[in-house]
Amino acid sequence: MKKSITTLDLNLLLCLQLLMQERSVTKAAKRMNVTPSAVSKSLAKLRAWFDDPLFVNSPLGLTPTPLMVSMEQNLAEWMQMSNLLLDKPHHQTPRGLKFELAAESPLMMIMLNALSKRLYQRYPQATIKLRNWDYDSLDAITRGEVDIGFSGRESHPRSRELLSSLPLAIDYEVLFSDVPCVWLRKDHPALHEKWDLDTFLRYPHISICWEQSDTWALDNVLQELGRERTIAMSLPEFEQSLFMAAQPDNLLLATAPRYCQYYNQLHQLPLVALPLPFDVSQQKKLEVPFTLLWHKRNSHNPKIVWLRETIKNLYASMA
């Protein structure tokens, strides 16, 4: 006997699609911002409605049954049509599009012109609001004041800025990973010395105040070695540290992400980049995963999905 769609909770179809994509109850639950138990209950309802197991457990995760495989394309088309329907209001001029970008202003400046052009092509009357990433930015995403954040996180096990430490309500995608390097003027005396940890620590440093902290993973690695750097100046932005390091007769060293080379070339600063004088395991702790962040409630918002994809494409073109 044919069943009526009125007897099916359509929210269950979203759950079904995510299960098909993730092949995992736990991962589907994370994307839906619910507990695995809730997803298991939804799967039980779907099995009863379709009178089919839909998925069976295997060492590789959930394996779809033949019925589920046969429905995959139809389900994807149904979800696409649903998104088009929900996108109708978003084709009206959106107000106050907000981008939350990393504190590293060079990262913002590298993409701002290209991003704004693409955004105005899609939404000609939209507005763009940019703010620097700071200690309150994750809360701003949670409060709905920011659509998307773009922030460098940290990899050191002792860091408070690990991806695994993000609030459960925040979804993310790593766009690229960077390893910081040392920036110094082209005629800096350190360039005439053996480049090692002693030379690195012999000169004064510029530190960046990151989310209300003057220290970061670099200082953690040095502490593990029983060493520390002399911080002569603290600044809020990386581009300011590059500018100061480039000044004539300045002995200051700036440590900033490698991507700052784009900013360097743009402004023709007389700087040279050297690798941090650490071994491979220590360098690994200093990796910075640059990450798009958004609230889970926006994971399927067509405007936000488009924005994420646009930013991803911009950075892919830079690689």
Swiss-Prot record:
DNA-binding region: 25-44
Keyword DNA-binding annotated: yes
Keywords: DNA-binding, Transcription, Transcription regulation
InterPro entries, alphabetized: LysR-type_TF (IPR050389), LysR_subst-bd (IPR005119), Tscrpt_reg_HTH_LysR (IPR000847), Tscrpt_reg_YidZ (IPR023746), WH-like_DNA-bd_sf (IPR036388), WH_DNA-bd_sf (IPR036390), YidZ_PBP2 (IPR037402)
Domain HTH lysR-type: 8-65
One Pfam family, short name: HTH_1
Function: Involved in anaerobic NO protection.
Record-stated family: Belongs to the LysR transcriptional regulatory family.
HAMAP family: HTH_type_YidZ
Name listed for the protein in its UniProt record: HTH-type transcriptional regulator YidZ
Organism annotation: Shigella dysenteriae serotype 1 (strain Sd197)
Gene expressing this chain: yidZ
